[in-house]
Amino acid sequence: MQVPPDPSAADMKRCFDLVIFDCDGVLIDSEVLSCQCLVELLRCHDVVLDLESAYTQFLGRSGVAIVDHYTGLGRSLPADFGAELQAAIRGSFARSLRAIPNVETLLRGLDITYCVASSSDLERIDFSLAVTGLRGLFEGRIFSADMVPEGKPAPDLFLHAAARMGARPERTLVIEDSVSGVQAAKAAGMRVWGFIGGSHYRFRNGRALLMAAGSDRVFERMVDFGQESADWGHDSIQR
């Protein structure tokens, strides 16, 4: 499926009918918390994984995908591992989760239809958005990998969300922070902009990572979303 050329900010509404936001790392600053829980829980089951590897291997992936990964390596995890992980993450979120700075202002002022599509299960998405005060902005517009046969990097979730929202793939923009999410959006025939404003990209070259995955542009602050700028696609973080 052919995607139209990358638009300027002034052309956004003309080019797009729908913006799909990923949740973790885009709407909420959750990836460090989630990956810390994963590393700690795996350690309890005698599986060693450092935080950087957790970002690289599992950012944007579902709990089922994580279990399948280790099963494929011959490392069996308990049948209730996914439930254990979600319980640990929920506790961490209740204590420490915050929304990405300025994302609420962006959403309230956005003049394009939008929704959220995440690899997380519906209960976790709902809880995360409620904790951060964003839940009311997505009423009836929440889509989970639970709804489709294959999660990211397969295109199923984004295609499902776009279809439910009445938008064609080529007129849909996806905002993603993970390699698997970028790959899923491109496989769906959608435009994708990488977001590197989450805490998990503080010491990583997020621009290079997401551009290599196929992202059309990369930005690091929600206040920059959709603004015409000569340095769109350039990582202004000096590392």
Regions found by a protein language model. Name each.
Residues 2-56:
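Active-site neighborhood of HAD-like aspartate-dependent phosphohydrolases
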Residues 26, 118-120:
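Conserved phosphate-coupling serine/threonine residues in phosphotransfer and NTP-handling enzymes
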Residues 33, 58-62, 98-102, 120, ...:
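Short beta->alpha linker loops
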Residues 35, 39, 55, 63-68, ...:
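An amphipathic alpha-helix signature
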Residues 41-42, 62-76, 128, 162, ...:
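Helix-loop "lid/cap" segments that line or gate small-molecule binding pockets
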